[in-house]
């Protein structure tokens, strides 16, 4: 039993005098919960539990970073409330069918039995269960049924990833109807925000200094705190850029570089071109990711990797690439395929290397051995990104790190740099992104076969890949280097077991070595080193663009200014068209301008 505070003791003594729980026909009878099932709690879980038992709120919102143990916290609350008859049954609402099974397994460790097979069509359940597992969609399809169950007996309702309650107006209305009379409601989320203004049910909003309504959590445990406590892994982002080429519906051909200032439409199309499984970018990035995974498995033999794809077609294509490149067939998980849940469980409990998924493994699914990720989707909302990265941060032993390979796209780089920022859901944001912004829509909210209208008539012509930068702890390290180079290998070969301080020191050391080598190569050179390396105009343009991008990275590290500022300063000094339309002479002039900028700042 717990013995934390006087408030907790008063709670227990009062509940011990409660009457035995009655039988209620087909709804079952309350099963006793043994006090022997009390797995040890982490620090944040203990503090939140003391707060909850001391205040006894009807509604409680716990915001904790993915991988920190929200499920265990909620199950401990449920066990306490059942043991002292504050409630007589538990209903847990989750986003997916697989999570129903995952929660039921976790509940057993707390002495709780939850029915993961409960169905609207057959609302009877065995009296041996303490409660049921349902999905948000299941509640929305028959809210009256769940309201009757909730009103029949004192009920604790646990909402896993409560932000899903605002996914559709009908969902929010159904959840309020079904659980408005619940005795207790416990809401959990690792991402207490949405990309729209849909209010999250049973969450309080308070005006900030500007009068804007912001969601209010009762207890918050962020990524930075969890990292300091060793609860989650440090995350290293390896951002890959490259020159992308495509043709539009009018037959016009375009070329642009990922990571450079582009219009939203150009960025979206360059991004999509890079993710094309038939191109050169994805095979190069997958090769790098697999090399990183093999490095980690030298220290952590069961470490696994996951590619997050945009849709079923590309997921299967990436799986074929993996099979060809690694001689090992990956596990493929598509949320609308039979047996997906079983395949996730098999992968989680096994030692195979790669998993390819669309959406089903992007949120809530617990696969602690995932250590390497390839973010191969064009979803760019903070919500989807945070939930996807959350699949890789669960720590099992000291020193484990996660490595995520991402396209060098401004939206993603900003999200990667701000991983430790704690966000709240804001209603009525004055400058909310336009619904027509090609980068604002989240493909994860579409069906897995849907294609956007902007894709019709679009043809990807190819994209090369190079390591643009490494992001860790909000800082950028390294300069652009081709895939397969020794410099890329230095970053891919970082030891698999390092704490945050060791990782930071090592990245600084690698960057200093890289910059020193680059400076030595450029010293004494009267012309760009690559000016005669390629006989063709195409080859010379490619090499000059690469050198220009390297100089931008060097300027970024020397000045501390963002890449966008450096590009703006370069344009101010020498003007000219976008780099895809620039001549060799114009690119050389830009290289000279950046060298001048670097000399001014050194």
Curated annotation (Swiss-Prot):
GO terms for biological process: DNA restriction-modification system. GO terms for molecular function: ATP binding; DNA binding; hydrolase activity. GO terms for cellular component: cytosol; plasma membrane. Residues 430-439 have a biased composition (Basic and acidic residues). Gene3D superfamilies: P-loop containing nucleotide triphosphate hydrolases. Residues 51-210 form the Helicase ATP-binding domain. Residues 430-452, 518-538 are annotated as: Disordered. SUPFAM superfamilies: P-loop containing nucleoside triphosphate hydrolases. Residues 523-534 have a biased composition (Polar residues). To M.leprae ML1624. This is Uncharacterized protein Rv2917.
């Amino acid at each position: 039993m717990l013995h934390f505070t006087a408030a907790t003791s008063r709670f227990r003594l009062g509940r011990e005098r409660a009457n035995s729980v009655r039988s209620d026909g087909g709804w079952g009878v309350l099963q006793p919960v043994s006090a022997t099932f009390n797995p040890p709690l982490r620090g944040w879980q203990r503090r939140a539990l003391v707060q909850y038992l001391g205040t006894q709120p009807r509604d409680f919102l716990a915001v904790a970073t993915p991988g920190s143990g929200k499920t265990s916290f909620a199950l401990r609350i449920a066990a306490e409330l059942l043991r002292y008859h504050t409630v007589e049954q538990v209903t847990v609402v989750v986003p997916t069918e697989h999570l129903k099974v995952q929660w039921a397994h976790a509940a057993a460790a707390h002495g709780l039995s939850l029915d993961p097979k409960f169905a609207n069509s057959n609302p009877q359940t065995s009296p041996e269960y303490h409660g049921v597992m349902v999905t948000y969609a299941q509640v929305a399809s028959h809210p009256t049924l769940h309201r009757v169950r909730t009103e029949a007996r004192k009920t604790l309702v646990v909402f896993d990833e409560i932000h899903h309650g605002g996914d559709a107006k009908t969902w929010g209305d159904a959840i309020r109807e079904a659980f408005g009379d619940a005795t207790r409601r416990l809401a959990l989320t690792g991402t207490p925000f949405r990309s729209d203004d849909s209010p999250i049910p049973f969450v309080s909003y308070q005006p900030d200094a500007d009068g804007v309504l912001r969601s209010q959590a009762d207890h918050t445990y962020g990524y930075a705190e969890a990292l300091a406590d060793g609860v989650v892994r440090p995350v290293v982002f390896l951002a890959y850029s490259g020159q992308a080429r495509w043709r539009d519906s009018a037959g016009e051909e375009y070329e642009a570089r990922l990571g450079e200032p582009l219009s939203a439409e150009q960025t979206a199309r360059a991004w999509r071109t890079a993710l094309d499984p038939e191109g050169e970018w994805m095979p190069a990035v997958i090769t790098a990711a697999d090399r990183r995974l093999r490095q980690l498995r030298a220290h952590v033999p069961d470490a696994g990797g996951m590619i997050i794809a945009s849709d079923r077609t590309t997921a299967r294509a990436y799986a074929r690439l993996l099979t060809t490149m690694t001689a090992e067939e990956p596990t493929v998980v598509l949320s609308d395929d039979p047996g997906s849940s079983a395949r996730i469980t098999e992968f989680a409990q096994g030692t195979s290397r790669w998993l390819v998924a669309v959406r089903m493994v992007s949120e809530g699914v617990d696969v602690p051995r995932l250590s390497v990720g390839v973010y191969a989707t064009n979803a760019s909302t903070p919500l989807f990104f945070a939930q996807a990265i959350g699949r890789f941060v669960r720590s099992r032993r000291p020193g484990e790190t996660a490595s995520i390979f991402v396209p060098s796209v401004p939206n993603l780089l900003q999200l990667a740099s701000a991983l430790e920022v704690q966000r709240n859901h804001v209603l009525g944001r004055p400058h909310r992104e336009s619904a027509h912004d090609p980068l604002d829509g989240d493909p994860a909210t579409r069906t897995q076969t849907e294609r956007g209208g902007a894709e019709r008539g679009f043809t990807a012509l190819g994209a090369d890949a190079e390591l643009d930068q490494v992001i860790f702890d909000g800082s950028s390290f390294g300069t652009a280097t081709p895939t397969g180079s020794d410099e890329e290998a230095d970053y891919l070969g970082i030891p698999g077991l390092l704490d945050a301080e060791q990782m930071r020191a090592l990245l600084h050391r690698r960057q200093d070595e890289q910059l020193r080598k680059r400076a030595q190569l450029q010293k004494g050179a009267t012309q760009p080193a690559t000016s005669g390396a390629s006989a063709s105009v195409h080859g010379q343009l490619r090499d000059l663009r690469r050198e220009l991008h390297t100089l931008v990275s060097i300027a970024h590290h020397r000045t501390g200014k963002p890449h966008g500022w450096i590009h703006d300063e370069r344009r101010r000094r020498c003007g000219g068209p976008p780099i895809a339309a620039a001549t060799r002479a114009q690119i050389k002039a830009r290289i000279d301008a950046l060298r001048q900028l670097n000399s001014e700042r050194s």
